[in-house]
């Protein structure tokens, strides 16, 4: 009989490098706990991410991981799942990575109904670039890229 895994078993030994107070910490801890509660196998779990603050996620998991290029996590994750259908494949993305740069890939992976889990971190800004507005930024958001306020209405994610 094997000992059930705990949330701590899913945490890697990598230093978490998000900004103090960032909500990404809470998401990471919730995923650690959820995987343990579900009895998921570390050896059959893969996290695929693109670029952005959220995309550091695979480094912080004691599972398999793939840190790919901006917006392409859904495409890579699809390939992982098709080649290894027994794996539990997760896409980790942010509002900029998943809804702007990779919006087309996100749309098509949803349309194809690939057996993936997608966690989209929506902070309404490109955090890694320190404040560029994103597809989910509220209209009027002032940022380095929109000093007069964004004119675009947000995508409802």
Label each region the model flagged:
Residues 34-37, 64, 85, 108-109, ...:
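Hydrophobic alpha-helical segments
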Residues 4, 8-69:
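Active-site diphosphate/adenylate-binding microenvironment
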Residues 17-21, 92-96, 142-153:
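Flexible, glycine/proline-enriched loop segments at strand-loop-helix junctions
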Residues 23, 27, 72-76, 156-157:
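Catalytic-loop motifs flanking and including active-site residues across diverse enzymes
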């Amino acid at each position: 009989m094997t000992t059930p895994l705990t949330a701590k078993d899913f945490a890697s030994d990598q230093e978490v490098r998000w900004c103090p107070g960032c909500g990404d910490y809470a998401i990471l801890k919730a995923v650690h706990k959820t995987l343990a509660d579900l009895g998921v196998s570390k050896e059959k779990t893969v996290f695929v991410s693109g670029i952005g603050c959220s995309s550091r996620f695979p480094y912080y998991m004691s599972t398999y991981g793939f840190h790919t290029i901006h917006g392409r996590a859904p495409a890579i994750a699809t390939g992982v799942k098709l080649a290894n259908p027994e794996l539990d494949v997760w896409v980790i993305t942010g509002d900029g990575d998943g809804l702007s740069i990779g919006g087309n890939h996100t749309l098509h992976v949803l349309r194809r109904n690939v057996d993936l889990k997608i966690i989209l971190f929506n902070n309404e800004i490109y955090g890694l670039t320190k404040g560029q507005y994103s597809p989910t930024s509220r209209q009027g958001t002032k940022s380095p890229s929109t000093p007069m306020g964004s004119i675009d209405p947000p995508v409802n994610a």
